[in-house]
């Protein structure tokens, strides 16, 4: 079984913000799998499905970004999911918009959701799908304001293709392994 975690913040005011692209990616993946039923457990919205006969649990922590590990750690323990079967999808300001990077065992890069998960798991040895949201064009815009801001109209126009590519990357990680997936999808 695999655990696919999309990071974001709960609540309508955050729904279409850059910081919630992890939630958006999980929603897109679940939609492609027929929208499996969602349960509220482990301080998260979770759903079970299969990706090409591989059982997966989708998770959207409802704890706010900085406490995401409070959902991930107990969920992994309950289902006995090993760290090598954890994929965390999150926003990445150091990647240009619509680019992505698959990495394993890397630092948190200042991302508070990753800090929370790594801190509670006691390890960074899990796969991350870093979805590029870019940096603010105006250097006077603070990063927190930028990531909590909504995507531009131009970015929204590219979103279906970007999320489809993210879904393909998750499938490739599961079916082909991180090395092949990284070679194919890292931009």
Swiss-Prot record:
**Main localization, broad class:** cytoplasm
List the disulfide bonds in this chain.
none
User: At which residues is there a site annotated Discriminates between blocked and unblocked aminoacyl-tRNA?
Assistant: 9
Q: One Gene Ontology cellular component annotation?
A: cytoplasm
Give its E.C. classification number.
3.1.1.29
Function comment: Hydrolyzes ribosome-free peptidyl-tRNAs (with 1 or more amino acids incorporated), which drop off the ribosome during protein synthesis, or as a result of ribosome stalling.
Q: What protein am I looking at?
A: Peptidyl-tRNA hydrolase
Native species of this protein? Bdellovibrio bacteriovorus (strain ATCC 15356 / DSM 50701 / NCIMB 9529 / HD100)
Name the gene behind this protein.
pth
